[in-house]
Amino acid sequence: MDFSTYDAPGALRDGTPIRIRAIRPEDGEALREGFAHLSEQTIYHRFFQSKRELTEREVEYLTHLDFEHHVGLAAVISNPAGELLIGVGRGVRLGGGRPGVRGAERDRTPAHAEVAFVVGDEFQGQGVGSQLLAHLAGIARALGIRYLDAEVLPGNRQMIDVFAHSGLPVTEQLRDGLVHVEMRLEEVAR
């Protein structure tokens, strides 16, 4: 399946319709604009540092995706002027398996992808991150990925809660000052 044309309906908790769609190269300006409206705390939670803007190189990386090794989804609200980007989720395949595993052993390990999310401040707590995660998990399964990994600051309870309530088997481990989250995709808790 060609995930570069991915598009699915969703809704905020208040019922406002949204779309979860593939990020496209022409989304660069919307990413810049959305970033400019993020609070310092949201930026720090996503990037683990303060930053004022996205560089050209970052925008290129975030919008030119192959949808096999690097998948990006945008949550958008349609309005008369076009679309309002309210959140982004992405997954990047980590080689053939766990980071740091080499050679034949790497080929025998399950495929992992690292995921990251950012949701505009006024839309946090509205289910956007959960929907982005659910759609990324579905795409990852179709691509043969068996685990989603994330690194989260311990103070980012909202994101940790999104993972914990995803319906996926989740393990958390505090390592080097970050919460390492691993979500197993081959089975879903019911």
Where are these regions (language model features)?
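Long, contiguous binding/interaction regions
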Residues: 1-190
